[in-house]
Amino acid sequence: MDKKAALVIVDVQNDFCPGGALAVAEGDQVVAPLNRYIERFAGAGLSIFATRDWHPAKTTHFKAYGGQWPAHCVRGTSGAEFHRALRLGGRATIVSKGMAADADSYSGFDGVDAAGVGLADLLRRAGVTRICVGGLATDYCVKETVLDGRKRGFDVVVLKDSVRGVDLAPGDSARSLEAMIAAGADMLERFDDLVL
């Protein structure tokens, strides 16, 4: 890899970790490997982006309003905060998504930074051509972020040691990884294989 790479951390928030409103099994297990990637990318002077679900209290995304999911990651709540052990340390640009009351937003590319700039534009402004993606959940927001990244012309690497899935149906995560590969994403099995 070269200076055109960036790390994209997807939705490592309290509500997606054990004890959260929409917990992913072993969701907190992505934190330690992601912290290693954060240190590696920051040490190399490369960009880091962290997406987050940032829902209003009332949204058609939630079951109570006709959606699929229990209420989760409501902006301003502890459930919407990043996992306390994730060491972003002010080094990441925060990208918020799912802010509309009447729409689902799974992809990080649906999100914007504090100034309203979308992830694709942020990446392009930084000269990024390759994104390395990890986080939660493999079969929803990670998958959609990876697929959107490919559609937008980015090279994409999935950090397999740093993703976990919901698996509402058995095998959803495995099928999602297959879909990402079919779309042209590369898989990095473990941190030690990363070359910057």
Region locations from a protein language model:
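Glycine-rich anion-binding loop/nest that anchors nucleotide
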Residues: 128-144, 158-160
